[in-house]
Amino acid sequence: MRTAVVVGSLCMATDLGMALPFGHGLGSTVVAMRLADRLGVDQATTVQTYYGCLLFYAGCTADADVQADLFPDGLAEHWTAVMFASQRKSMAGVFRALGSGDGGRIVRTVRAAAKFPRAGRGYKHHTEALCEVAEMVATGVGLPRTVSGLFRLLTERWDGSGPLGRAAGADLPLAIRIVHVARDASFQCLLRGPAAAVEVVRGRAGGAFDPSVVDALSVDMVEGSTDWARAMAAEPEPHLMLGGAQIDDALTTFAAFADLADVIGHSSAVADLVGQAAKHLGRADDEVSVVRRAALVQDLGKVGVPFRIWHQDVAPSADDWEKIRLHPYYTERALSGSPYFAELARVASRHHERLDGSGYHRGLSGSELDLPARLLAAADAYCSTIEARPGRPALTGAVAAGKLRAAANAGTLDPDAVAAVLDAAGHRPERIVRPDGLTPREEQTLTLLAHGLATKQIGRALGVTAKTADHYVQQVYAKIGVSTRAAAAVYAVKHGLATDATREFPR
């Protein structure tokens, strides 16, 4: 399979996470490739530009819990248009986003002022997490180091005023400079049309943007296409390819990216369980692979739902539920560009459907739901029950089994699928080999860290002081080679260390 197919599908999901129109990232990439061609860049820079632009927002789910608290209505509406503007205008956009919500202008201003100091203190950390997660995602989907290494410089600016201060001017890779101009030009085109977009970008030359790249931009280049085929055709040759286990690794990265928005490790846990359940039913290897891979991508659409909904301690409102019910549709839509992912998208988008037609998002029933969809629905329901969620503790496996049997008796879940899932859940093998030399205690620390616990909470869970817990955390960071909790969570998912969500963690 072409790597571009995998990365392009993930790009569609990042459009969701940034509240952009579907296909915007594809169109931006077409613009970036036109710029690269006009500048006459070398082959290596062309490859970097293509994949760097597709995955520009790959870190958008980093620190989703913090984003949910600070920006309950999202950041994109107020910030994306000014992210490459002057520092003053960019911060003004952040301030407006902090104050978004109910109330008049005075209420919103007071709300923003109350949050602004905390947002300022956490800004550098969030930026580091964004870059680190994007780099890990790029690596996870099979891109070479020459591409994934770009993402640590994702937020830098030509004039050196980037928040991390890692590069400026000609030290900033040319591919990043091209991507920045292409992404902003494409977004400005959405707001005001091609000619005005080019004028806005020209006004940012010498600030965020390399003047020589801006000089190469013209109105005809900005009219990008959101067509999947055109974006795939823009991929530099020779095409990068993925096969076999590499595809599974890439889809596990999809799972980690999606789960950062809600419950860390959920999709991987469902994939492990439903794969075992399918084997228990004697399904062929290719059928097992399809349902397992579908589980890994089933919640990709969650990134299109405001993060506050997944992290609030109160029951969702009627309006919230309408948004929640859309996430399987978003999953299907994000995967719809590629014929290869068509079967995965079909199964994945049905994990909340029920036999009696009471599920969502299509309200399918009975014969409209095949065995893979029925297995996935049962496995997802089981894993959701044994995971701690905002507003409720994790329930035991016994309680989860009782709930699934009751659902089967009521005709909402398939009895055979429920039996297979429960059989698989009762015979899950323990993992013995520990990655990167982590001790059992460090594994525990990483699991707690991945589930969002602060240092004091980790200490309480492990029965140690906060100082000792912090020591464990730093040891974990050093061994796995990361520096932020979001990146640690991605690592935990990849190595199967985030799925132990069967207990209620101390808050």
Predicted regions and their residues:
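Histidine- and acidic-residue-rich, metal-dependent catalytic cores
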Residues: 1-437, 443, 499
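Base-recognition residues in the alpha-helical recognition helix of bacterial helix-turn-helix
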Residues: 56, 298, 471-478, 490
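Hydrophobic residues on short alpha-helical segments
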Residues: 179, 376, 446-450, 477, ...
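A ubiquitous, low-specificity "background" feature that marks scattered single residues
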Residues: 216, 272, 420, 448, ...
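Short, Lys/Arg-enriched C-terminal cap helix and immediately downstream tail that follows
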Residues: 336, 478-493
